[in-house]
Structures are given as C-alpha cells and as structure tokens.
C-alpha cells in the first residue's frame, strides 16, 4: 500500500524516528501503525546494542523539587549536538517528572519505572536507536527535607539541589544558596560533615609542608589547625563567604533570615567533571 506524508508525520510524532525510518517501517507493517511502532522499536534496540561500547561523554542534567523532595537526573549521550536538542532535553524532563511523582531510591529503581508503557531503561534504549547515538541514564540523586530547592545552571551541564531544616524559606534565599553551591563547589555543609579521611589527608599535607619549611615543632599543631580552618572556610558551605556579599558567610546570611535556619544537605552534579 502507498504510504502518505500524513502517515509518516503521525508515526514520527508517536516515535520520534526519522522520516525514512518511519516510511520504511510503515511499508514493512503494511500501513499498520502499531506494527510500525514495533518495527522501529526493534530496529532501535539493534542499533543501540551496536553502540554499547561507545563512550557517552556528553549529556544533559536537570533538577527539580516538589513538596520536600528534590531530584537530579542526568542522561548521557555521545555528542553535544544531541545533548542540546529539544527532543533529548524533553526526554530528561520526562524522566525527572517520574522521579518527583514516584520518589525512587536508587538509579536501578528509576530504570524500572515506566514512561509510555515501557521501563525507562528500555525507553532510553529505543530513543538511542532512533537517534543513532548511545544514550544511558547516567546519574540520579535525590534528597528530602522540610524545604527543598533546585537550580540548573544555563547549558544543562550543572545542577544543584538543596534541603533546608525549615518548612518556610524565602524563594530568593533558597536560590542564592543553590547558586552559591553551583559557583563555589563546597564539599560539605559544615566541617563536621567532612569525611575523616579528607581531614586526615589535609592535616598530613599541612604538617609535612610546615616541616619542610623548617617550622619549629612547638608551633606545628597551631600551623596545622590554621591550615585546616582555611580549608574549612574554602570548602564547607556554611563557612564560605557569600558570593553576593563577601563580607558575610553563608551561615551569617541564613541566620539573618531566621535564627535557626540552616542547610541539612545538598547535591551538586557537574557533567563536565564526571
């Protein structure tokens, strides 16, 4: 049977496949849309499997929050051209929406949830076959708190989610903190939450440096403590100078809004550093 332009357009809307792929699938399926969709899916899986060994070094990362739950999703692909395409970004948005509605605990749990009647891992594989590039769900992070905020830096390569200890936080204040994390890349909320191994490493580095410089043993501990305090100020969120007002720290900024307001936890994902 003859395949019309309208038939091809309809199938493209259903699958996102290219014009020739849709035309050939309709011919193979003798005009049956459901069969044509299956033809495209099977072809997509074959193409995707051939690309498994390729490196997916580009991608798109998005974040959002809803009613005390915030999540970050990153889907990886091979080229920046695909990563910036509206179809690819929309795919990540759909996955992100699923996380807000279902609150999965692991990336494996997320892969097993459904979009358009298919498991997300299978859905991505089909999209991979259609696009001709390897695609994979690369990162999933979430947090829960009385108040949450999400921030996505322009370009969709860097995203942050933050949880606060109070239910009511001014939108601009929450956004300021999220943007601070994006810009300054702290490794923890405060010094008490820095892993012990990192503290030990910094102590060792500071002590060895002081000894190499011939500093008296009597003041080594003081030098080490000074180096640690400098490290804490640079890499812990609450002790960092506020980017928008360097005369105060983030802790000062939060306390200026509400005496007990603080950050419980945060996540920061930068695809360029993964």
UniProtKB/Swiss-Prot annotation:
GO terms for molecular function: translation elongation factor activity. The keyword Isomerase does not apply. InterPro entries: EF-Ts_dimer_sf, Transl_elong_EFTs/EF1B, Transl_elong_EFTs/EF1B_dimer, Transl_elong_Ts_CS, UBA-like_sf. It comes from the Bacteria. Signal peptide: none annotated. Its main location: cytoplasm. Associates with the EF-Tu.GDP complex and induces the exchange of GDP to GTP. It remains bound to the aminoacyl-tRNA.EF-Tu.GTP complex up to the GTP hydrolysis stage on the ribosome. NCBIfam families: tsf (TIGR00116). This is Elongation factor Ts.
């Amino acid at each position: 049977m003859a395949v019309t332009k309208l038939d091809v357009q309809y199938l493209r809307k259903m699958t996102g496949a290219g014009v020739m792929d849709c035309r050939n699938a309709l011919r193979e399926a003798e005009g049956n849309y459901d069969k044509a969709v299956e033809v495209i899916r099977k072809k997509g899986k074959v193409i995707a499997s051939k690309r498994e060994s390729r490196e997916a070094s580009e991608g798109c990362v998005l974040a959002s929050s809803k009613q005390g739950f915030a999540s970050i999703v990153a889907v990886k692909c091979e080229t920046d051209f695909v990563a910036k395409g509206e179809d690819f970004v929309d795919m990540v948005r759909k996955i992100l929406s699923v996380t807000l509605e279902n609150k999965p605990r692991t990336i494996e749990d997320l892969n097993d949830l459904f979009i358009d009647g298919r498991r997300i891992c299978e859905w991505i594989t089909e999209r991979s076959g259609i696009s001709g590039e390897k695609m994979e769900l690369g990162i999933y992070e979430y947090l829960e708190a009385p108040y949450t905020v999400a921030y996505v830096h322009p370009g969709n390569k860097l995203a942050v989610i933050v949880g606060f200890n109070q239910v009511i936080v001014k939108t601009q204040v929450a956004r300021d903190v999220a943007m601070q994390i994006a810009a300054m890349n702290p490794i923890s909320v405060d010094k008490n939450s820095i892993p012990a191994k990192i503290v030990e490493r910094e102590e060792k580095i500071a002590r060895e440096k002081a000894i190499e410089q011939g500093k008296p043993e009597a003041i080594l501990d003081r030098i080490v403590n000074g180096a640690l305090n400098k490290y804490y100020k640079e890499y812990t969120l609450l002790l960092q100078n506020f980017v928008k007002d360097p005369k105060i720290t983030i802790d000062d900024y939060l306390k200026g809004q509400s005496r007990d307001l603080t950050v419980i936890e945060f996540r920061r994902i930068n695809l360029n550093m993964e």
